[in-house]
């Protein structure tokens, strides 16, 4: 029963439930918790569960008007992180009804909205989420997916090759188009707008779209294969973004691009729906991801951002390169590359996968290896990423 004693109440009395059996419909989260000195890990884990679901800092009479048992998040398991002092993995189960269907925005607002500024925690990181089919089925997911993309491009059995046009800022639209033509004519499948190329004074978006489309069709005619240029539709408003996507559709180009973290999940999901309805592929750049995922003990791991993107919608997403980094990085990167491409991914802690994830029939996303790679990296990249990937040079 709800106690009405005045004052601050320990969260663990209500929200730490080690005997809880998780339901197939629960959304499960794994948090890396670093409590403040003197705060027991159970209290810290329960605080996260409470603050990201139904809890507040005291008992209020309106608690009696609803069923907390039905709606509260529960911290159901805590384990110390091996090799780290005062760090714990807290597992939290959220009832499905806490989340709006088909909204990545609402999912993140609930799970990571408030808790990260919490006084009882020194640091907090969301390491993984288990999205149940009951929830993932409320999302459209990628506009087309890997198989449909290959059919559209008529390119099979190999990674796709792309490059980013440089210098990324400062070229006129006509010279930019020239560079696109040379790259595509020379044998690349795709060229790419840089993520910062939107619509600046030296090159307005419509001029760029026209010259790139011209370059594309010329290269297609001369090579006899289908070519693409990721036209960056990211804009200051969602309406402007959709206007740019509509212009790309009218030009008949195969693919547009979006910066999904700076643009936001709501805008991204709208664009993904537009792309499916209008036969456009959607390339996703992850500008700003390191702000969120770089710290080991605070923020959100990229595998969560990647899962969220698969739900929100995108056909390609940048996912790091692995080349030249540590071995451990390689396994972790391959873990979230599998989460992007495969239907069913087994729990595997060595690859950072905390939960078994079943996507059922949601289309896959092509991982894009991009950032500081050159031709000598090719053998390593093809071995790491396999056929279903985009190797993006420049």
Curated annotation (Swiss-Prot):
Name it.
Answer: Ribulose bisphosphate carboxylase large chain
Post-translational modification N6-carboxylysine, affected residues: 192
- Residues that bind substrate, according to the entry? 114, 164, 168, 286, 318, 370
User: Which species is the source of this protein?
Assistant: Nuphar variegata
- What is the required cofactor set for this protein? Mg(2+)
Q: Which UniProt keywords apply?
A: Calvin cycle, Carbon dioxide fixation, Chloroplast, Lyase, Magnesium, Metal-binding, Methylation, Monooxygenase, Oxidoreductase, Photorespiration, Photosynthesis, Plastid
A molecular function GO annotation: magnesium ion binding
The cross-references to PANTHER family, in alphabetical order and at most eight, read: RIBULOSE BISPHOSPHATE CARBOXYLASE, RIBULOSE BISPHOSPHATE CARBOXYLASE LARGE CHAIN
Keyword Signal assigned: no
Top EC class of this enzyme: lyase
């Amino acid at each position: 029963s709800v106690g009405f004693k005045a004052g601050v109440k320990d969260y663990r009395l209500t929200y730490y439930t080690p005997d809880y059996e998780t339901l197939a419909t629960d959304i499960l989260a794994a948090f890396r918790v670093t409590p403040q000195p003197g705060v027991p890990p159970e209290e810290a884990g329960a605080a996260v569960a409470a603050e990201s679901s139904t809890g507040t800092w005291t008992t209020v009479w309106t608690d009696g008007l609803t069923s907390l048992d039905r709606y509260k998040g529960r911290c159901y398991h805590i384990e110390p992180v091996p090799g780290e002092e005062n760090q714990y993995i807290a597992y939290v189960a959220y009832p499905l009804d806490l989340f709006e269907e088909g909204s990545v925005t609402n999912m993140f607002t609930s799970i990571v909205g408030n808790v990260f500024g919490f006084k009882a925690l020194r640091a907090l990181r969301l390491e993984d989420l288990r999205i149940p089919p009951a929830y993932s089925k409320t999302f459209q997911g990628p506009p087309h997916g890997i198989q449909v993309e290959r059919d559209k491009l008529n390119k099979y059995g190999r990674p796709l090759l792309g490059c980013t046009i440089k210098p990324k800022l400062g070229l006129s639209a006509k010279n930019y188009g020239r560079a696109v033509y040379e790259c595509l004519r020379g044998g690349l499948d795709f060229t790419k707008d840089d993520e910062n190329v939107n619509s600046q004074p030296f090159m307005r978006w419509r001029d760029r779209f026209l010259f790139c489309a011209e370059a594309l069709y010329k290269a297609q005619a001369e090579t006899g294969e289908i070519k693409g240029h990721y036209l960056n539709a990211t804009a200051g408003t969602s309406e402007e973004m959709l206007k740019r996507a509509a212009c790309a559709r009218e030009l008949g180009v195969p693919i547009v691009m979006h910066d999904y973290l700076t643009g936001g999940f709501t805008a991204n999901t709208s664009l993904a729906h537009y792309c499916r309805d209008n036969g456009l592929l959607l390339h996703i750049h992850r500008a700003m991801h390191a702000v969120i995922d770089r710290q080991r003990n605070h923020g959100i791991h990229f595998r969560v951002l990647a899962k969220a993107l698969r739900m929100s919608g995108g056909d390609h997403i940048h996912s790091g390169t692995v080349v030249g980094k540590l071995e451990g990085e390689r396994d972790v990167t391959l873990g979230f590359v599998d989460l992007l491409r495969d239907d069913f991914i087994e729990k595997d802690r060595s690859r950072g996968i905390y939960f078994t994830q079943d996507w059922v029939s949601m289309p896959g996303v092509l991982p894009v290896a991009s950032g500081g790679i050159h031709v000598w990296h090719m053998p390593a990249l093809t071995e790491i990423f396999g056929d279903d990937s985009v190797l993006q040079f420049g």
